[in-house]
Structure formats: structure tokens, C-alpha cells
Design a protein with these regions (language model features):
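Nucleotide-activated chemistry modules centered on ATP-dependent adenylation/adenylyltransferase
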Residues: 1-141
Length: 141
């Protein structure tokens, strides 16, 4: 899943001449360690791991701000995601760029299909993949 998403992003970035910073390590072990005691509450830990890493990468790279593609998904807990991102910004001293991209979700999916992009069917974690086969997706608001 991670490799498929990463490869698609790298191809797109190259096609539009977009500089891209990519972590080569998916970080499965740190993620599993972080969520082991509360698998059902894993999303906040995942958000923390991902957004703090993005903020730190922005700081290390001398960027003015950071954001996340997670903000386009209606399937994520948007408010929690935003709160974690602002905490990461405060702790790293790098501005967090906030925009609610959810209204563009369907158009983005359509465009991605037109371009032949890989479209994931779940958030990407192994627990979410399991849930994907157990119950229908629900949209969080």
C-alpha cells in the first residue's frame, strides 16, 4: 500500500516538476509500538507520528510551513487531525498551513482516475485494511 502510494506520488511530482521530499521508511514498527495498547484509538497516534514527522522535515528542510494530504479525506477525523497538526507546529516552530480540502474530495478522485493514478481504498494502516473487509466505510464529519 505504502509503496503504491509513494510511487504514484513520485510519478506525479516528476510530471509536474514538483520538488518532493519522501521518507523511504514506512515506519510500521514505530506505528505498531505506538498503538499496541489502544488499537481502536490508533488514529490519534498515527496523526501524531505522521504530522510531527512532517513538521520536523519542514523544519530540517528550511520550509516555512507544512500541511498534509490527509485534509482532503472525509474519512479522517478532521478536527483531531487539525489539532494534532497545530500542536506539531507549535512544538517545532514551523507554521501549519490549514485548509479544509474535503469539498474537493470527489473531484480529486475523479481526476485521479482520469490520470490513471493509484487510489487507495483505506487509510493505509494494517488495522484499517482489516476493517475495510469487516464493515462499510463511514464518513466522519
Amino acid at each position: 500500500e505504502y509503496r503504491a502510494r509513494r510511487s504514484c506520488l513520485q510519478e506525479y511530482a516528476k510530471a509536474i516538476d514538483l520538488p518532493l521530499v519522501v521518507r523511504d521508511d514506512y515506519g510500521l514498527r514505530p506505528f505498531v509500538r505506538a498503538v499496541a495498547d489502544d488499537i481502536d484509538g490508533r488514529c490519534v497516534k498515527c496523526y501524531e507520528l505522521r504530522l510531527y514527522a512532517a513538521a520536523q522535515a519542514a523544519k530540517d528542510g528550511g520550509f516555512d510551513a507544512f500541511t498534509s494530504s490527509l485534509f482532503i479525506s472525509p474519512y479522517q477525523n478532521h478536527e483531531l487531525l487539525r489539532d494534532v497538526a497545530y500542536r506539531a507546529a507549535e512544538e517545532t516552530g514551523v507554521q501549519f498551513y490549514y485548509e479544509d480540502f474535503r469539498p474537493m474530495f470527489r473531484d480529486g478522485q475523479t481526476r485521479a482516475r482520469e490520470l490513471g493514478f493509484y487510489i487507495q481504498k483505506y487509510c493505509g494502516c494494517v488495522f484499517s485494511e482489516q476493517e475495510r473487509y469487516q464493515k462499510p466505510n463511514r464518513i466522519l464529519r
